[in-house]
UniProtKB/Swiss-Prot annotation:
It catalyses: 4 porphobilinogen + H2O = hydroxymethylbilane + 4 NH4(+). This is Porphobilinogen deaminase. It comes from the Bacteria. Tetrapolymerization of the monopyrrole PBG into the hydroxymethylbilane pre-uroporphyrinogen in several discrete steps. It is an enzyme of class 2 (transferase). The gene is hemC. It comes from Cytophaga hutchinsonii (strain ATCC 33406 / DSM 1761 / CIP 103989 / NBRC 15051 / NCIMB 9469 / D465). GO terms for biological process: protoporphyrinogen IX biosynthetic process. Belongs to the HMBS family. GO terms for molecular function: hydroxymethylbilane synthase activity. Its EC number is 2.5.1.61.
Amino acid sequence: MNKTVRIGTRGSKLALWQAEHVAACLQTKGLEPQIVIIDTTGDKILDQSLSKIGSKGLFTEELEEQLHAGTIDIAVHSAKDLQTHLKGGMYILAITERELVNDVLVSHKPIDTLKNNPDLIIGTSSTRRRALLRKFYPQAKMVDMRGNLQTRIRKMEEGACDAMLLAYAGMHRMGYDSLIKEKLSLEEFIPAAGQGTLAIEAASTLDKEKAAVIRAVLNDAATETAVSAERAFLRTLEGGCSIPVFALAVERDTDYLLTGGIVSLDGTKYLRKEIRFTAADAEQRGVELATVLLKDGADEILAEIKKGLSKS
């Protein structure tokens, strides 16, 4: 077996940290990783909100093209950015162990919680976070905030906003824990499907022996089961990264609990339900939960969201 593993990644500091983390893990098993930096559409277009650009493969398409061409062996994605319908011949080889999944309130100012600071100007590029803010903290003012993590923090410190809502995992990986003011409640801010973990994508042409070694090193079975249910839920709702859908599966003593839902752009309509599942029926139960929500009115909320995004 050829021990070289070419790892495709975006070029941001966070993406490189993730790729280097994967590389370090692979080195422990005698593999020889090489990191290949690839620019994506989402990295190049920074003057528009994510919802205006579109939701299909913004941060992944170019990586998949290189997988298909055989110039890289695996691609490292933030699992929440990986579209639910993969291109032909592509598959998820591994899901890494999950970090803390919470969204966090980030600021350079002496503030503590969202509740105690109702008039903050909050920066975020996520339609899910914006919609949940409108539901639970309707008095908050929001501004769109694009760019890599360092750019967004710089913009905040220069006065573009008082605080930002971001994923804990990225802040922690980049060493910005001192800027985290509050870990937001999972009762209010349920994360995006796959948040806090990495998805390792490969092409079906990858050498089977090499694929098995990579999977054995990187895959966390419990996280894979949880993310499988979350992605099945998201896929059934047809929710891309510009649709405010949330999903989180948590391992319990003998099974898992999946909580999933959708919120309208203005925060006034909110559906959320739960379902239990096991490793054997994770995808099936994710589909079932989404189907129940669609029957309960999620289809109407989705139609309203898509109409609203097309006008914005």
